[in-house]
Amino acid sequence: MGWISGFRLRLAANALRNGRIVAYPTEAVYGLGCDPFNEDAVRKLLALKRRSQIKGLILIAADVEAVESLVDLARVPLGAEVRAGWPGPTTWLIPPRPGIPDWLRGAHDSLAVRVTAHPVAAALCRVFGGAIVSTSANLSGHRPARTPVRLWRQFPRRAIHFLPGRLGGAVRPTAIFDAMSGRRIR
């Protein structure tokens, strides 16, 4: 997956803490992320992508413990399956813990979460100190960016802090499942 310096990771984590949007490599495409608990940052990210808040957002984390601060896996019928598939390219829809902001869930009763297996994305979450928003780097309705060139064609450089790195080997975006029913959503 390539090596990334601690300095670059700290710069990106500080950008997140300061309400900026960060572009970073994920399993299949470049992602755009921000601090999920900074409402202004989330709104800025949605506006940049021209994405409706109703859709909700995915949060990624470096480990299960970070996800458990957001959702209660013990109450989920498929909790063992969820844990067994992480880290990995599967996102699960899980009822959130009390106090999780509405702007993350959109019009849904669940929160989309994943423990990423991508080394750069996971390292960014670790250095940041928790989960981050992870949405594909593209304008709504356009193809996700798989190269920095495509990223910069869609977004102004001044709007995004870029964390370089190679994409993972996945060809499609991660699968999404409902952890209560097991139903595949995407």
Curated annotation (Swiss-Prot):
GO terms for biological process: regulation of translational fidelity; tRNA threonylcarbamoyladenosine modification. It is an enzyme of class 2 (transferase). GO terms for cellular component: cytoplasm. The keyword Nucleotidyltransferase applies. It comes from the Bacteria. Its EC number is 2.7.7.87. PROSITE patterns: YRDC. One of its GO terms (molecular function) is L-threonylcarbamoyladenylate synthase. It catalyses: L-threonine + hydrogencarbonate + ATP = L-threonylcarbamoyladenylate + diphosphate + H2O. Keywords: ATP-binding, Cytoplasm, Nucleotide-binding, Nucleotidyltransferase, Transferase, tRNA processing. InterPro entries: DHBP_synth_RibB-like_a/b_dom, Sua5-like_dom, TC-AMP_synthase, TC-AMP_synthase_SUA5. Its main location: cytoplasm. Residues 6-186 form the YrdC-like domain. It is found in: Cytoplasm. Gene3D superfamilies: DHBP synthase (3.90.870.10). Required for the formation of a threonylcarbamoyl group on adenosine at position 37 (t(6)A37) in tRNAs that read codons beginning with adenine. Catalyzes the conversion of L-threonine, HCO(3)(-)/CO(2) and ATP to give threonylcarbamoyl-AMP (TC-AMP) as the acyladenylate intermediate, with the release of diphosphate. Belongs to the SUA5 family. TsaC subfamily. This is Threonylcarbamoyl-AMP synthase. It comes from Methylococcus capsulatus (strain ATCC 33009 / NCIMB 11132 / Bath).
